[in-house]
Amino acid sequence: MWKLVGWSLALLVLVGCEATATSVPDVEQPTSVDPITDSKTISILAWNVESDGNDPSVIAEQLNAFNGYDIFCLQEVRAENFDRYTAALGRQFQSINGRTGRSDRLQISFDSERFELLETKELMEHRDFILNNGTHRSPLYVRLQDRVTGIQFIVMTNHLARGNAELRKQQAIGLREWGRDQNVGVINIGDFNMDYDFATERGNSAFLEIFRDNIFSWAKPVEFIDTNWADRDGDGKDNYPDSMLDFAFVPGPAKDRNPVCRVIVRDGDFSDDDSTSDHRPIELKLQ
């Protein structure tokens, strides 16, 4: 549920993160408090920037052009580009950088003039559920507090396993159970590699697991638009058209914030080349 000193936006990364000039408490779960409604919009942009297939200077320019967002959740970030991408967002942004994932790390950046950082974690596991087998990305989250309203929330970002279907399924189960155990609202956003097909309206086994027991709901985009370009055979055509890898998930009570998601399409974003990302960003706004 939404809480005055707590509603959560979920971005996943929990094993120790780097925060800029901020002391971070190691708290497993947010504190439960009385509910309150905040009328001010919170806007989030999530984007897999394709760590090994982009020109970092081009990505930084594109990030700089995204104005008006409070929180950025990036996937596939090389460690040497953390500072570059943070600087591109503006002086008021503070970043939490994931330590897992080798060259494909996670990064969450937020407007530090609006929000105070209370907690951050990368999750290797939750209860008995594995979220990282040691060679992948751990879910990353931050717990923030609005400096004006006092409202607290969690933002979690993810990049689930691509080539290991069984691990991806276990990650989805672990995230679902993590969401079940939270006592504040949660938004989980990022690249989930769940292979949702527009024609069949189905995803893979991880897609099925994350929705089991109705813990998470999908903030479906207002228009279904392909979020990933994959030309594995080099013929200039997308091998998986009309599909999605990138999602925004919210718990049932988060619907009270009227979440609106859309896929951001820019001129020339697809087909992908060596300077740009092979993913389109997604945007989530909560009223």
Spans of model-derived segments:
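Active-site-proximal beta-strand elements of phosphoester/diester hydrolases
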Residues: 41-51, 119-123, 141-143, 152-162
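N-terminal, active-site-proximal structural segment of metallo-dependent hydrolase catalytic domains
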Residues: 17-90, 99-106, 122, 173, ...
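Solvent-exposed loop/turn segments at secondary-structure junctions
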Residues: 49-53, 77-81, 100-104, 113-116, ...
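Structural recognition of the beta-strand scaffold that forms the well-ordered cores
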Residues: 43-46, 70-75, 97, 106-110, ...
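Metal-dependent phosphoester-hydrolase catalytic domains
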Residues: 24-29, 121, 180-187, 194-287
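Extracytoplasmic, non-cytosolic globular domains
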Residues: 59-62, 138-215, 219
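Bacterial N-terminal signal peptides
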Residues: 6-15
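Structured beta-strand-rich core segments of catalytic domains in phosphoester-bond hydrolases
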Residues: 77-152
